[in-house]
From Swiss-Prot:
The lineage of its organism: Bacteria, Bacillati, Bacillota, Bacilli, Lactobacillales. Its EC number is 5.1.1.3. The gene is murI. GO terms for biological process: cell wall organization; peptidoglycan biosynthetic process; regulation of cell shape. Coiled coil: none annotated. Keywords: Cell shape, Cell wall biogenesis/degradation, Isomerase, Peptidoglycan synthesis. This is Glutamate racemase. It catalyses: L-glutamate = D-glutamate. The active site is at residues 73, 183.
Amino acid sequence: MDNRPIGFLDSGVGGLTVVRELMRQLPHEEVIYIGDSARAPYGPRPAKQIKTYTWELVNFLLTKKVKMIVFACNTATAVVWEEVKEKLDIPVLGVILPGSSAAIKSTISGQIGIIGTPMTIKSNIYEQKIRDLSPQMKVRSLACPKFVPIVESNKMNSSVAKKIVYESLSPLVGKIDTLVLGCTHYPLLRPIIQNVMGPDVELIDSGAECVRDISVLLNYFDLNRSRTSKVLHHRFYTTASVASFKEIASDWLPLAIEVEHVTL
């Protein structure tokens, strides 16, 4: 047993989609979350800068004595997850492999779409993982750089959001039966994405799939929080506006949360 919290990092609020799933599947675990909204989105940034920013988030979580770190950010996973995983002596999980595996299990036609930030798509990491696991799969990748700013500005339900999603996804419509939401911000746009793609296209939430791996590793390393420890103290940190973070989180998480501003 290990009552230390699980650390989550993201470029902003998108990783809350992963935290929500953790709270649903593993409600006894405690969360510490850091979202770097002040420097979001990470996707258009150079790899070197993404690496620097991500290490700052990792080091922040380490000061909080976490027992595991979850990269709730596809861009950071694509750029620096392997490096961090090799250097730390606690488990470090990313969202890309779980999402890739789920897409392969879901598809019937073998036609899979990937949407993500420019850096995630440029890295080809989803395509590589999918083809490593199942070489016969046909993968279509599409960068959607306008999606993260919509979410970070809390305009998910606006007419502008609907227009941008429709225009962005049109190259994939009618060509795939499975679509990986390759950015943890994107599930916040899920209803619009589903409407554009149609009811027959299965949407894969890579962050939600990651939580299943968290559960496996907690069991494997005997890191589960004691079920007799009833008091949970979830802590959330943002590098930008606390009010904006709370507003988005209130629509997404099943409880009121404590949020603090932090400067990295």
